[in-house]
Amino acid sequence: MTMKTHLDLEQRKQLHGTAYVEQYLQKSPKRLRDLVDRMNIEITSDIVDFGCGDALIIEYLKDVVNSYQGVDFSPEFIRVANRRKMALHAKNVKFQCESIPDFSRHHKNSFDIGFALDLSEHVYDDEWQNIVTAMHDCLRPGGQFYLHTPNADFLLEKMKQHDFLIKQFPEHISVRNAKSNSHFLSVAGFENIDVKFIPHYNILRGLHPMSKLPLIGKFFQARLFITAKKPIN
């Protein structure tokens, strides 16, 4: 679901400025550890992190992959990410501050694994397809892609959509459901698309057992973890 007011690129960059970066640093690292554990990663893997943010995830990846490259359009996030890289002495880590389509033009067929964690909800539909296709192009044939994002069918997201008791985060301009996210991946050329509904990473994770209930279960499926593959041929 897309917000009613359409923000231009500069407005969105301002939303992801210093204040947002500082707020983001307070998020629980456990959610990233849980997501990494869901990925099929090997020591020989070359990884690209689309919308890498502050790159807290490199703490869990730098010693178990061949290389990691993060790309983000926010200079503030890239500065924080580079400071983290230096503090961790992560020599196999690199960051690039640019758009994903621009990054893709000079990184085609370059990575075994790509992921976009909590990125898609920050991008409008009319831009997202181009970005998903660019991410697809960055992967080598047979490469694996992982997407993590809020689920638009989750009860709390429904409430935000209608401004009922709780408002949507201003940065979350396009929260989608499983069907919509899968469609974008399919159009880009991905195959073997698999959707898993996983718990929220805060106190709301306590609602997840209710996701098994008939008829109303979908309203308690907080997060999406989607796996897809770039065809070999």
Q: Where are each of the predicted segments found?
A:
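Conserved N-terminal segment of class I S-adenosyl-L-methionine
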Residues: M1-N109, I113-L117, Q129-V132, G206-H208, ...
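Short catalytic micro-motifs in class I SAM-dependent methyltransferases
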Residues: D118-H122
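A short glycine-rich, Lys/Arg-flanked "PGG" loop and its adjoining helix->strand segment in the class I
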Residues: Q129-P141
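Conserved beta-strand signature within the Rossmann-like core of class I S-adenosyl-L-methionine
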Residues: G143-T149
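A C-terminal cap/extension of S-adenosyl-L-methionine-dependent methyltransferases
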Residues: Y146, K160-H162, H183, I193-N233
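Short, glycine-/aromatic-enriched active-site segment of Class I SAM-dependent methyltransferases
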Residues: P150-H172
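Short alpha-helix
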Residues: I173-A188
